[in-house]
Swiss-Prot record:
The keyword Ligase does not apply. F(1)F(0) ATP synthase produces ATP from ADP in the presence of a proton or sodium gradient. F-type ATPases consist of two structural domains, F(1) containing the extramembraneous catalytic core and F(0) containing the membrane proton channel, linked together by a central stalk and a peripheral stalk. During catalysis, ATP synthesis in the catalytic domain of F(1) is coupled via a rotary mechanism of the central stalk subunits to proton translocation. This protein is part of the stalk that links CF(0) to CF(1). It either transmits conformational changes from CF(0) to CF(1) or is implicated in proton conduction. Disulfide bonds: none annotated. Keywords: ATP synthesis, CF(1), Hydrogen ion transport, Ion transport, Membrane, Thylakoid, Transport. Gene3D superfamilies: N-terminal domain of the delta subunit of the F1F0-ATP synthase. InterPro entries: ATP_synth_OSCP/delta_N_sf (IPR026015), ATPase_OSCP/d_CS (IPR020781), ATPase_OSCP/dsu (IPR000711). F-type ATPases have 2 components, F(1) - the catalytic core - and F(0) - the membrane proton channel. F(1) has five subunits: alpha(3), beta(3), gamma(1), delta(1), epsilon(1). CF(0) has four main subunits: a(1), b(1), b'(1) and c(10-14). The alpha and beta chains form an alternating ring which encloses part of the gamma chain. F(1) is attached to F(0) by a central stalk formed by the gamma and epsilon chains, while a peripheral stalk is formed by the delta, b and b' chains. GO terms for cellular component: plasma membrane-derived thylakoid membrane; proton-transporting ATP synthase complex. GO terms for molecular function: proton-transporting ATP synthase activity, rotational mechanism. This is ATP synthase subunit delta. It holds the Pfam family OSCP. Belongs to the ATPase delta chain family. It is a peripheral membrane protein.
Length: 180
């Protein structure tokens, strides 16, 4: 069975090669973010693109209508190529992989932050600086989400590293040490 990275990587790498050739890495990254947010917001669009009974011309027409004026023409051509190769259903994964390649190119890390309450700008700044110190990255992309089960504090995930500074995590560690 083919792993998803074997499906996503060649297309994401090809898109990155075109972007680098044209000096449009960041623009294509913005387009990839637009794809991901649009697909996340529209289940109908996702289902339409995944529908094997629709003709390629119909899918291309929808993509042109939805993204045509918003994305770079080379990116629109790329979308049409994905339709022609029956890979358009993998657009979200390809866009995610492209963004990962862009972060690597720019020496930027992604930090997934869970907190009990929404983070303030000051808290985001502190977390950004701390992650930069820990990773040596030039920049940090913060993806935050609220998890009321944490009670307080934050959990920060960067790659395979996890920093648990939550009240729930502290209580769990105390419980384990008391049980020992």
């Amino acid at each position: 069975m083919t792993s998803t990275s074997q499906l996503f990587d060649p297309y994401a790498e090809a898109l990155m090669a075109i972007a680098r050739e044209q000096g449009l890495e960041d623009r294509f990254g913005e387009d990839a973010a637009l794809f991901r947010s649009t697909l996340a917001a529209s289940a109908d669009l996702r289902h339409l693109l995944e529908n094997p009974t629709l003709f390629s011309s119909q899918k291309k027409a929808v993509l042109n209508q939805v993204f045509g004026s918003s994305v770079h023409p080379l990116v629109l051509n790329f979308l049409n190529l994905l339709v022609d190769r029956n890979r358009i259903a993998f657009l979200d994964g390809i866009a995610d992989r492209y963004q990962a390649l862009l972060r690597k190119l720019r020496n930027v890390v992604r930090a997934d932050v869970s907190s009990a309450v929404p983070l303030t700008e000051a808290q985001v700044q502190v977390i950004t600086e701390k992650v930069k110190q820990l990773t040596g990255a030039a920049g940090v992309e913060i993806e935050s989400q609220v998890d009321a089960d944490l009670l307080g504090g934050v959990i920060i995930k960067v790659g395979s590293q996890v920093l648990d500074a939550s009240l729930r995590g502290q209580l769990k560690r105390i419980s384990i040490s008391l049980a020992a």
